[in-house]
Amino acid sequence: MLPNAAGLLVAGVVSLSGVAAHGHVSKIFLDGQEYGGWIADVYPYMPEPPETIGWPTNVTDNGFVSPDRFSSPEIICHRGGVPSAISAPVSAGGTVELEWSTWPESHHGPVLNYLAKVDGDFSDIGPSTLQFFKFDETGLVSGSNPGYWGTDVMLANGRRYSMMIPSTIAPGKYVLRHELVALQNVGAAQLYPQCINIEVTSNTTGGDVNPGGTPATELYSPADPGFLFNIYEQYDSYPIPGQDVFRD
C-alpha cells in the first residue's frame, strides 16, 4: 500500500487529471489477459511508479504530437517515451484490445496500428532504430460531416479498440505502436501515439515473415492529405495516412 503522503499525491493528481481533454491507454488485453498501461497523468508524479508493458512517457497533460513534430522523437512513442523493460505474450493471430482512459466524442479520426521487431532486450531499444510496419487501421467507416470514424468505433466499444496480430509474422519481441489521430481542427491534426512491448508466440501455422518497416520519424509528412482533411464537408472516402497495411 502507498504511504499516506504518496497516496494523497496520487489522489490529487487524479483529481487534476480529470480536467484533461484527452487520454492514454490505461488497460491492455492480450489474448484476453489484462495488463496495466502507463497512466500518463499519474505515474510520472510517483517516486516509484509500477513497471508496465506500456512505455513510460512524460505526457502528464494527455496531450498530442502536432504535424510540425513528425520528424522528431516525439512521434515515435509520444513525448518523453522511453522503452519499458518488461513485456507480455500474445499469440500470432491473437487478439489485442486497448482501452483508453477517456476520449472526447468530438475528436473524430483514424486509428492506426504498427509493429516493429526487436532484437535484444527491450530496455536496450533505441527508439529511432525501430522499423514499423502497419498491420491494422480503421479510417472513415461511414457518413460525412463529420462522419463515423475509427475513434468512434473505439468509443462505441467502451473506449476499447481491438486488433488481430498477423498470424504469419515470425515469433519474437515487438513494439506495438498504437495511434489515434484527431481531425476536429482542420489543418491541425493531433496524433496520440502509444507504445507497448509484446512477445509474439508462434501458432500452428508456424509463421516466419519479417515484413520490415519504416522509422516512425519517416512515416508521415505534414502535407499528407489525411492530416489536412476537412471532416466538416461532404465526402465519401478518406486517404488514411501511413503505409499500406500488411496482410497475411
Swiss-Prot record:
Gene3D superfamilies: 2.70.50.70. GO terms for cellular component: extracellular region. Its EC number is 1.14.99.56. InterPro entries: AA9 (IPR049892), AA9_LPMO (IPR005103). O2 binds at Q190. Keywords: Carbohydrate metabolism, Cellulose degradation, Copper, Disulfide bond, Glycoprotein, Metal-binding, Monooxygenase, Oxidoreductase, Polysaccharide degradation, Secreted, Signal. Belongs to the polysaccharide monooxygenase AA9 family. This is AA9 family lytic polysaccharide monooxygenase G. It comes from Malbranchea cinnamomea.
